[in-house]
Amino acid sequence: ELPKLERDVFDEEEIGRALEELDKMVGQTGIKKQIRDFVELARHYSHEGVKLSSRMSLQWCLTGNSAMGKGTVARIIARLYKAMGIVDKGQVFDFKVERMIGLMEDEAQRSIGEALVKSSGGILLFDEDSPKLNEAVGFRERVRALLMNQMAEHPGSYIIIYAEPRNRVSGINGDAEHMSDLVNVLVFEDYTKEELMIILKRRLEKERMKMTATARQYMTVFIG
């Protein structure tokens, strides 16, 4: 089972560093607020000596278009969970669901089981964000059912972060109606033109490069 959240187990310095990394992300102000609110609520329950998992979900669903930072946010959540004493390892095991296309059911079950074992003590990022899955009707639902069956055998033993394409939030059990009771949902908004330019500038700076005025003008038109 997940360790019981006790009072004063929070590593506030590490929480601060994780939140600093969160703040460095471009845009996504709503997501930043949701995560900070989660941390504050978790801190409140910790001070009260209340087991966090008895009051709020520890599972997450990240939905949005590709390349919006879902993997980065998953790693930040893992760091926060380790600092809060929720998991032993602040690591994320990335499981690409598209790799299961074409597998027999017993092979798929074995693959999911191995992924859960590898993620034990950390977090499993169950990545369903792939255009290949759109072509396989009902595939996501079948794979999700296999995952749920294995998790049901060891309730409370695993923490899952689901990464889903935009407008496909289905929740931990595939039931959108009850989804908010079972997972914390983070919706990634598309970047604005200004935010895309900031991201481009940062990447160029990492390569010790700069845009010329002509290049900047071209990119402004291209992004627009």
Regions found by a protein language model. Give the residues of each.
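A short beta-strand-to-loop transition that corresponds to the Sensor-1 phosphate-sensing loop
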Residues: 127-129, 160-168, 190-191
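Short glycine-rich substrate-engagement loop in P-loop NTPases that contacts/grips substrate
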Residues: 89-119, 141
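A short helix-turn-beta junction within AAA+ P-loop NTPase domains corresponding to the substrate/partner-engaging
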Residues: 173-190
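Conserved P-loop NTPase "ATPase switch" module shared by AAA+ and STAND
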Residues: 96, 118-139
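Pre-Walker A (pre-P-loop) alpha-helix and adjacent loop at the N terminus of AAA/AAA+ ATPase modules
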Residues: 15-58, 79
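Conserved catalytic/switch belt of AAA+ P-loop NTPases
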Residues: 130-161, 176-180
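Conserved AAA+ ATPase small/helical "lid" subdomain
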Residues: 1, 25-26, 186, 190-192, ...
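Walker A/P-loop
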Residues: 54-90, 117
